[in-house]
């Protein structure tokens, strides 16, 4: 029998329905792969082996009765930001040490309803704050990719680095992730996987640990475009428990795969051409335009004049919302509690010990921009800029642009021990320069691998769509995928 971990979601789904193998066999193959590789890659922070085998056995029963859901028997990894009933959920932060929720997030509940199997919880940057998966309390995740002729450890991107690394290393068929400023798309680009950040409101945020509530959105990371389409259909839903959830029909995203894009207008924003950007990324961007032109699309130049202000505005808004959301972690009701002579000292010691440096930095920034005298100067101004950025995108779509093509990141994955980036917050934040405008406006965006750098590392292109037009950007992403091919890391781990 072929290595079952090499199958995509679509291939595994079809084979399970035909009875080529059982869900328990597929799940066991992944659990064995995790046991060997996780000590090296550190993608999982908790492995739920017994629960996985139980869920797989239930899937086999439903498959035998012809009652299969759209993800029946498919083993998935779950980012540690999603609440999973009675299973370790900490946002990879020490302050939530030992927390096991007595409720299930809407996104994961949707997946289980459709027959998916949970392999475990995936590593991530603490509270989703980071671009390299180095801020996790459980240590960094190692990218399965390596440069040609080098054994240097590379970052997998962040904050969903565990999700992207696990998918790339065949430690799950697909994974849930979240995206506040690029945390699905950037890790996908760094690991040669596909990741889609849906429109804000498409997937419920209920039961997902909040970072910045007006920016957070759940989405899938998969091995190819079709897999992301299949997962997104299950993850998306209207949810009355989430006041920002949108009550719109959920399309069968897989049906758009393979459809023609002839006559579509693809916008190329001039503001994304940065002087310091890698020439390889510029060449890849041009190659992506050529792929789409050959498929019958029309390439048009557009302008998004206010996106140059997106990154600083994003870090003001995100930090402000984070400082408010993280105020709930006080050691009183759940998670870590440090001893103190009174409640104030207990608060101080708990939060000081429980939060990592990056989280503390963002809380301090957020508290500052929300403080008296600075609220108008920073937070209100950032929200006004956000409106201007939205207007720029609205104007482009109003003139008939169907989607916008940009790079995902200015460079390929960088080294885990890259002190130049590690010790420079601005350099780290610049990893999100092409992705944050999408979150500021709430639009859908997908990252698709489009080539390799000269050092053999994957590079991705981003497609940005109109609100709730995920099927359009998936349709276009599939064209790029077919032209560029798919990319797999050469296995060096056990």
Curated annotation (Swiss-Prot):
Enzyme class, spelled out: ligase
Alphabetic keyword roster: ATP-binding, Ligase, Nucleotide-binding, Protein biosynthesis
UniProt-annotated catalytic positions: 79 (charge relay system), 159 (charge relay system), 183 (acyl-ester intermediate)
GO biological process assignments: translation
Keyword Nucleotide-binding included in the entry's annotation: yes
InterPro entries: Amidase (IPR000120), Amidase_CS (IPR020556), Amidase_dom (IPR023631), AS_sf (IPR036928), GatA (IPR004412)
Annotated SUPFAM superfamilies: Amidase signature (AS) enzymes
GO-annotated molecular function: ATP binding; glutaminyl-tRNA synthase (glutamine-hydrolyzing) activity
Catalytic reaction list: L-glutamyl-tRNA(Gln) + L-glutamine + ATP + H2O = L-glutaminyl-tRNA(Gln) + L-glutamate + ADP + phosphate + H(+)
PROSITE patterns named among the record's database cross-references: AMIDASES (PS00571)
EC number per UniProt: 6.3.5.7
Any one cellular-component term (Gene Ontology): glutamyl-tRNA(Gln) amidotransferase complex
Pfam families linked: Amidase
Keyword Lipid metabolism recorded: no
Superkingdom of source: Bacteria
Function per UniProt: Allows the formation of correctly charged Gln-tRNA(Gln) through the transamidation of misacylated Glu-tRNA(Gln) in organisms which lack glutaminyl-tRNA synthetase. The reaction takes place in the presence of glutamine and ATP through an activated gamma-phospho-Glu-tRNA(Gln).
HAMAP family assigned: GatA
Family: Belongs to the amidase family. GatA subfamily.
Record note on quaternary structure: Heterotrimer of A, B and C subunits.
Protein name, UniProt field: Glutamyl-tRNA(Gln) amidotransferase subunit A
Organism of provenance: Bartonella bacilliformis (strain ATCC 35685 / KC583 / Herrer 020/F12,63)
């Amino acid at each position: 029998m072929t290595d079952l971990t090499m199958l995509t979601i679509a291939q595994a789904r079809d084979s399970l329905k035909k009875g080529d193998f059982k869900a328990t066999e597929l799940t066991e193959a992944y659990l064995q792969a995790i046991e060997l590789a996780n000590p090296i890659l550190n993608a999982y922070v908790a492995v739920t082996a017994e629960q996985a085998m139980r869920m797989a056995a239930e899937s086999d029963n439903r498959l035998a009765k012809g009652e299969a859901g759209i993800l029946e028997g498919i083993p998935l990894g779950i980012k540690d930001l999603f609440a999973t009933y009675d299973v370790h959920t900490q946002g990879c932060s020490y302050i939530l040490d030992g927390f096991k929720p007595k409720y299930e997030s809407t996104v994961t509940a949707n997946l289980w309803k459709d027959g998916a199997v949970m392999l475990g919880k995936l590593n991530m940057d603490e509270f989703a704050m980071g671009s390299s998966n180095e801020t996790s309390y459980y240590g960094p995740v190692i990218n399965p990719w390596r440069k040609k002729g080098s054994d240097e450890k590379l970052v997998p991107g962040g904050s969903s680095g565990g999700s992207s690394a696990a998918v790339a290393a065949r430690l799950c068929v697909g994974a849930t992730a979240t995206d506040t400023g690029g945390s699905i798309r950037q890790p996908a680009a760094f690991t040669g996987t596909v990741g889609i950040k849906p429109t804000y409101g498409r997937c419920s945020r209920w039961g997902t640990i909040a970072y910045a509530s007006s920016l957070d959105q759940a989405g899938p990371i998969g091995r190819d475009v079709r897999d992301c389409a299949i997962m997104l259909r299950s993850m998306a839903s209207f949810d009355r428990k989430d006041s920002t959830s949108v009550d719109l029909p959920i399309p069968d995203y897989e049906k758009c795969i393979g459809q023609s894009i002839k006559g579509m207008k693809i916008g190329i924003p001039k503001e994304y051409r940065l002087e310091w950007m890698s020439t390889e990324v510029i060449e890849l961007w041009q190659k992506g335009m050529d792929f789409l032109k050959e498929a019958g699309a029309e390439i048009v130049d557009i302008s998004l004049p206010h996106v140059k202000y997106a990154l600083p505005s994003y870090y003001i808004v995100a930090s402000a919302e984070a400082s408010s959301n993280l105020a709930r972690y006080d050691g009183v009701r759940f998670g870590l509690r440090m001893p103190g002579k009174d409640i104030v000292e207990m608060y101080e010691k708990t939060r000081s010990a429980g939060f990592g440096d990056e989280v503390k930095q963002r809380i301090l920034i957020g508290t500052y921009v929300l403080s008296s005298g600075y609220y108008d100067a920073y937070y209100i101004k950032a929200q006004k800029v956000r409106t201007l950025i939205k207007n720029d995108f609205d104007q482009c779509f109003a003139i008939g642009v169907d989607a916008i093509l940009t790079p995902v990141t200015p460079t390929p994955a960088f080294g885990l021990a890259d002190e130049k980036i590690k010790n420079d917050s601005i350099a780290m934040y610049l990893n999100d320069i092409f992705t944050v405008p999408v979150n500021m406006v709430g639009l859908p965006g997908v990252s698709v691998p489009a080539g390799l750098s000269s050092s053999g590392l994957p590079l991705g292109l981003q497609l940005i769509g109109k609100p709730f037009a995920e099927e359009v950007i998936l349709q276009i992403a599939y064209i790029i995928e077919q032209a560029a091919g798919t990319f797999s890391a050469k296995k060096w781990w056990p």
